[in-house]
Each structure stands twice: as C-alpha cells, then as structure tokens.
Amino acid sequence: MSIVRMTDLDLSGKRVLIRQDLNVPIDNGQITSEQRITASVPTIKLALEKGAAVMVTSHLGRPKEGSWTEEDSLAPVATRLAALLGVDVPLVRDWVDGVEVAPGQVVLLENCRMNVGEGKDDETLARKYAALCDVFVMDAFGTAHRAQASTHGVIRFAPVAAGGPLLMAELDALAKALDNPAKPLLAIVAGSKVSTKLELLSNLVNKVDQLIVGGGIANTFIAAAGHAVGKSLNEPDLIPTANRIVADAKARGAEIPLPTDVVVAKQFLPDAQASVKSLDAVDADDLILDIGPQTAQRYAELIASAGTVVWNGPVGVFEFESFSHGTETLARAIASSKAFSIAGGGDTLAAVDKYDIAQDVTYISTGGGAFLEFLEGKTLPAVAALQARGQ
C-alpha cells in the first residue's frame, strides 16, 4: 500500500493536524460510549511523544454548517480526552484561519462539520485546513468513505499527508482478509434485506469459498431455492438476483450453504413461542427468526475449518433470547477458531459484546459504512487520496 504512515515520520517540532473519528453518542452532555475516544488516544500520544504541536479535529452528529450549538459541540469530548491523556486539551472554537499550539501541546478543534463547505469538500476550506499544518494525519477510518474537506480535500493540499495508526490497522486487516486471505475464506453476511447488502454479496461471491447468509437475506435465498418461508421477511422481487449470486458462486466452485432447519414463531415478539422445524415444514403463518441447531452446528464446523472469516451481521433475531442461539453458536465458533477473523457493522459489534468475544476476534472494525463499502469493493475517497499522495 503506497500510503505514507504517520509512524514512519519525524514529527519533532512539526504542526500536526489529526482527523479523528470522535463522533460519540452524547446524552444530556454525558458521553454514553467512549470507545472512539479511547481508540484515538494512542495516535495522539504518539504524536506528542514525537514532539509535535498537535491539533485534533472530528465531526460530531450532523450540525448545520455555519452555526455553533452546544449540543453539537465537542466540549464533552475535550474533557474526556484530557482525562485520558493526562494533559490539558483546550477546545478551540474558531480555528479555520489559524491555531496557536506549541510542540508538546494538544488542542481539540471544534466540530469540523460546523465549517461552511466541509460537507461538499470545498477546495478553499480544504486549503485553509492544509495551511494549518506541516503534516496532516487521516486516522478516521469510519469517515474514509466520505469525500469531505477534512477527510479528502485537505489530503490533496497538505504539505505531507499520512495515514494514522488506526486507519492503517483497519486497512491492513481488510487487505489481509480480502486481498491475500488464508484459505478457505468464509464470509457471513446477514441482515434484514438483500437490497441493502446486494453490492456486498455480489462482490464477496467472487472472492469467498463459502458465503453464509442469514436473517431476512437468507429467507430470500431460501425462497429462491423453492422453499416456503411463510410470513418471514423476504424480497420476492430479488429472487432472480439471489439465483444469479448462487450461480456465480457455483461457477467459481464456491458454496452458499442454506439452512436445513430453522427456528420459527407465529409472532415477532421477545416471548413468542419458538419451534425448531426442518426447512420443508415451514407453515404459511410461520416467521423464520433464527437458524436451527443442526444448521448452526454445520456452519460452526465450516468456521472451524476456515482460514479467514469475515463477519457482517447476526444470523437471527439475537436480541430475543429464544432466537439468539444461531448467532451465539457462530460467534463462539469464530472465537474458538484459529482463523484470521474480522467483524464489523453495528449489530455485529453488539453481538460481539453480548457474547463477550472481543478478545477472541482478530480484528474488530469500527468503520461502519466505510467497512461495508470496502467489502463492496468500492474505492474509499480518503484512501484513494492518501495513495495518490504516497506515490
């Protein structure tokens, strides 16, 4: 990868602007999950240790450009960052035209989405960002799929543009999983709709050895194979698409294994009566809400023999205890497998937390939309810009 890495640069005495993803949930001024702040600390510490004058910025929510509001302010983040770093972290409100910061100091620059032109990647604004620093560091993988002034434009104009440790760890893990995977490569793609994961399925089917589908997506594939799915969430108009994906897999010698048993209920409720049925016994009024134990065991065996596992999406309604066993079985199989494993996506991370397996997954992506776009085979604007500067 032709990207300049921040870890390789001499930053002594340099003004360094770091774009982090500090977009954390805040309720009544209280941060409810500080995972992203904690993740950013090593990068900031490293820049300080290297003797840099450090400026950090991030977006928070979706403020109106050109107006400051307390609810969109990074003030609670500055307080938390100061506690984690053990140094003062002043919040600078109007910073586009210049920032005072000395080597060994760090300042947090107010929510960059408040700046007029940020969202549309305005060149004048991007040049102003670039003029603030000697080195720009892009460390926000979660926004790498957005072409904005602080994630794309500034990379073009900064004297030096580098990838930060968080961003590079994410890119290295994804490259290891997709570009040069230990075989067999198995992907789990689950979710409510084929339509939302269509590009993902279409891209992965050309890379994987096994593709396990789950949730509403699986129901559409089950229907495409000629089985009844009752009242289950599925997309009849996408049956031809599902058949094409299956044909593409077969042509490559890859496999999309379908469930042989499922867990059904008559209502979509946490306390609904759950019944295990073979796939050909699903009634017209049944809802398929999980894979059955036989299927879960078969999938777990595939995971155990995989060299690489990419996991995006729980295979059942794991929030309801009666319909969580499929997802739990696969989660535990991933945790105990020797494969290189990468997990990403909001619901997937919730499952990782629920079953407490974070320490047993090789790499957990916090990238969200950027993670999905990478899996879809798309070029991420920030990554492309960093590669162009690294040539």
From Swiss-Prot:
Localization in the cell: Cytoplasm
Alphabetically sorted, this entry's keywords are: ATP-binding, Cytoplasm, Glycolysis, Kinase, Nucleotide-binding, Transferase
* Protein family per UniProt: Belongs to the phosphoglycerate kinase family.
Provide one Gene Ontology biological process annotation: glycolytic process
Which biological pathway? Carbohydrate degradation; glycolysis; pyruvate from D-glyceraldehyde 3-phosphate: step 2/5
Per UniProt, ATP binds at K197, E319, G345, G346, D347, T348
Q: Pfam families this protein is in?
A: PGK (PF00162)
Q: This chain belongs to which protein, by name?
A: Phosphoglycerate kinase
EC main class here is transferase
Family annotation (InterPro entries): Phosphoglycerate_kinase, Phosphoglycerate_kinase_CS, Phosphoglycerate_kinase_N, Phosphoglycerate_kinase_sf
The record's GO molecular-function terms, alphabetically, read: ADP binding; ATP binding; phosphoglycerate kinase activity
Q: Its domain of life?
A: Bacteria
Q: Which residues bind substrate?
A: D21, L22, N23, R36, H59, L60, G61, R62, R113, R146
Question: So what does this thing catalyse?
Answer: (2R)-3-phosphoglycerate + ATP = (2R)-3-phospho-glyceroyl phosphate + ADP
As recorded in UniProt, its EC number(s) are 2.7.2.3
Question: For this UniProt entry, what's an example GO CC term?
Answer: cytosol
Assembly and interaction partners: Monomer.
Q: Does the keyword Nucleotide-binding apply?
A: yes
